[in-house]
């Protein structure tokens, strides 16, 4: 089954080492199995797999809604890292989606300035958060807004710190 191949590949790589693979988070594996099956029945989910012979080396989950596709998740066999299986799958997926007359746009769902996706998919959608107060002049809105800004700053700072620590560790 394609979802099992994806889950195994994702868990075998860096996501598995960091404990963030779907099969490692309680309930996530069961949820993704049910969700992909239900969405696939309606033509709204594809699991694509790149193989070297019979060996799966990369797999991704693509979600579809109306005329848009979303490259939701990617898992790779890091034993094949020197061949860039994630990039190879993304390139093949790009050709596939560009040839699909029903798809007008694709979202990588990657973070801004993602090192793998940016050189391949250069276009960007402007996406933002909107906070809508339910009561006029609600003071809670300003506090929530400040908390969201603080969270974003903390995440960026933490990511930078992790990057620096990894660079120091690899020296």
Where are these regions (language model features)?
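A conserved beta-strand-loop-helix scaffold within acyl/acetyltransferase catalytic domains
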Residues: 1-82, 170
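Conserved acetyl-CoA-binding loop-helix of GNAT-fold acetyltransferases
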Residues: 82-95
């Amino acid at each position: 089954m394609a979802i099992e191949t994806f889950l195994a590949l994702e868990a075998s790589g860096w996501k598995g080492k960091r404990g963030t693979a779907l099969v490692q988070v309680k309930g996530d594996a069961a949820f993704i199995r049910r969700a992909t099956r239900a969405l696939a029945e309606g033509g709204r989910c594809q699991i694509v797999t790149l193989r070297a012979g019979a060996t799966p080396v990369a797999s991704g989950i693509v979600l579809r809604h109306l005329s848009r596709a979303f490259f939701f998740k990617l898992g790779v066999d890091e034993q094949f890292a020197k061949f860039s299986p994630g990039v190879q799958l993304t390139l093949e997926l790009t050709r596939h989606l560009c040839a699909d007359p029903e798809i007008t746009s694709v979202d990588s769902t990657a973070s801004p300035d993602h090192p793998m996706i940016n050189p391949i998919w250069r276009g960007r959608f402007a996406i933002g958060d909107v906070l809508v107060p339910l009561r006029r002049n609600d003071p809670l809105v300003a506090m929530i807004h400040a908390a969201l800004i603080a969270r974003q700053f903390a995440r960026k700072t933490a990511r930078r710190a992790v990057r620096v620590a990894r660079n120091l560790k690899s020296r």
